[in-house]
Amino acid sequence: MTQVAKKILVTCALPYANGSIHLGHMLEHIQADVWVRYQRMRGHEVNFICADDAHGTPIMLKAQQLGITPEQMIGEMSQEHQTDFAGFNISYDNYHSTHSDENRELSELIYTRLKENGFIKNRTISQLYDPEKGMFLPDRFVKGTCPKCKSADQYGDNCEVCGATYSPTELIEPKSVVSGATPVMRDSEHFFFDLPSFSEMLQAWTRSGALQEQVANKMQEWFESGLQQWDISRDAPYFGFEIPNAPGKYFYVWLDAPIGYMGSFKNLCDKRGDTTSFDEYWKKDSDAELYHFIGKDIVYFHSLFWPAMLEGSHFRKPTNLFVHGYVTVNGAKMSKSRGTFIKASTWLKHFDADSLRYYYTAKLSSRIDDIDLNLEDFVQRVNADIVNKVVNLASRNAGFINKRFDGVLAAELADPQLYKTFTDAAAVIGEAWESREFGKAIREIMALADIANRYVDEQAPWVVAKQEGRDADLQAICSMGINLFRVLMTYLKPVLPTLSERVEAFLNSELNWDAIEQPLLGHKVNTFKALYNRIDMKQVEALVEASKEEVKAAAAPVTGPLADFPIQETITFDDFAKIDLRVALIENAEFVDGSDKLLRLTLDLGGEKRNVFSGIRSAYPDPQALIGRQTVMVANLAPRKMRFGVSEGMVMAAGPGGKDIFLLSPDDGAKPGQQVK
């Protein structure tokens, strides 16, 4: 029976927009999607959203290395991420970006409310500064040894080993990621969120019983060690949102990242023309349910900072956090050298999405345990469960129904009590899906599959088919088998969306949770076609080799204008002002005898002639083509005596050299002698 419909908003942690989705990411998105699909099957109103986490130092730095803008990079990465999630049938209602108008407005609103309510504090801090690059070093520009667990090579904001958060100044033996230099201390005014003011509220939330026991225990440790004010600002240069009325100061990425959940939902509401749901879901007294699926490495931000920010800005808090562990492959951390660091897109070139969805689901529980993807066990389990137990149940019976009875099922069940055993299991299996005890749900379903196959073995329709006068028995047995198959696939529909579509096409009926109470009787099914193919270790071997090759390709040096020719050391405006750039008309251009690189240019600066030797011959093999063209030259460069004569300046050109040299030209209207500023 359909439950009372609930309004539910579900999110996954926002993937960072500087890298590809891999199988570690997919655990969370598959877990959330299975849960969401189950909720939808039970008639609930579910909004399932996500976005790219698109701000911060790593994105700015990588874009610089690639020679593109951060906006261009995050745009390309968003398309890649969405393609990967669609390939795994992750049923998002909206996928957005934290670099959006909605997120900017909401970040500024929350910050303003926190400030007005007295939860933002200003103070001057000593901050690490790169003396070689002349810039303050945000968290991700600094690496060193964690001050808590002493793990080496950790970033300046949190430790990926023990999960601790800290300030960059607490790192042991810090180094600048940009230059490798040892940073020095400089003062800078920063903005802090007064997290300790919310300690009582957070402790009450922890004791409410909603959080996983492991999460609540970890939070208690943090309370006992004392909550600290949280630095929410970063100095320029930084890719993100500038803090209102604070030029050169930006919101730290972890302030606007969780607000991205709200921004993505706001964007979805706007797309729908829905003017009420955003407030209905996010208001302080909302009766909608809000769930965040996250990894155990970001519990600190989601269990402390995020609910405190929401409370302090008069929004509702999450109903619960659903936290999962990490993914290992073949019992070890994912390894690029071993080919077990596998991208989502690479997986889909060798296996279907349903296979990984099933394997992860079979291993997941409501606890925060790590999941091991054992590739040999993966092949065995998919073949044993999906192919041998479930799909085989249909194939063993469908042929007889199609050939002997024109696809029409029997008018009555052969064993109503057995069918009731299967439908009665809906309560236990449904509760397992609801409580995220996915492994238990799969075990219950496979136990039923064993019973169904045992029924077919005992009834032996292949024997009955050869016996005269037993057509009715044959139809009843095979119809019973197909009806049991239908119940099993209804229970598995949240896990196996692609297979479920094929099954629905064969059954000529939708797999609906509430409909299983009524078996398909006297119903016509379609011609049976192969539903799922066996997999083998050769596919695994090809997958691993492909992953190794991708790692080799990724390890190749980054190329591009900025990567090949890094920006030079910073100069002052006074230094730049010493350079006198002028528009020059090329009156004559000719080869230089004795040189295969130089052209001799005669330049008119509007009343003054200059003779310039320029190494652009390989790019301009016909000097005459340059005559009459305007360019830009350094007019106050000291004359340089060469064996061909004296060069009285330098023309400006772009490019790496050789044939790739591009002489600069001013727009039409510029006149010889005009200064370039």
Curated annotation (Swiss-Prot):
What keywords are annotated for this sequence in UniProt?
A: Aminoacyl-tRNA synthetase, ATP-binding, Cytoplasm, Ligase, Metal-binding, Nucleotide-binding, Protein biosynthesis, RNA-binding, tRNA-binding, Zinc
- SUPFAM superfamilies, per database record: Anticodon-binding domain of a subclass of class I aminoacyl-tRNA synthetases, Methionyl-tRNA synthetase (MetRS), Zn-domain, Nucleic acid-binding proteins, Nucleotidylyl transferase
The reaction(s) catalysed by this protein are: tRNA(Met) + L-methionine + ATP = L-methionyl-tRNA(Met) + AMP + diphosphate
Motif: 'KMSKS' region; annotated at 333-337
Q: What is its main location?
A: cytoplasm
**Where would you find this protein in the cell?**
Cytoplasm
Q: Which PROSITE patterns match?
A: AA_TRNA_LIGASE_I, TRBD
Q: Is ATP-binding among the key words of this record? A: yes
Record's cofactor remark: Binds 1 zinc ion per subunit.
Give the superkingdom in one word: Bacteria
Q: Could you say which residues bind ATP here?
A: 336
UniProt: Zn(2+) binding residues: 146, 149, 159, 162
**Sorted alphabetically, which InterPro entries does this protein's record hold?**
aa-tRNA-synth_I_CS (IPR001412), Anticodon_Met (IPR041872), Met-tRNA-synth_bsu_C (IPR004495), Met-tRNA_ligase_1 (IPR023458), Met-tRNA_synth (IPR014758), Methionyl/Leucyl_tRNA_Synth (IPR015413), MetRS_core (IPR033911), MetRS_Zn (IPR029038)
Per the entry, what this protein does is:
Is required not only for elongation of protein synthesis but also for the initiation of all mRNA translation through initiator tRNA(fMet) aminoacylation.
> What's the name of the protein?
Methionine--tRNA ligase
The organism encoding this protein is Salmonella newport (strain SL254)
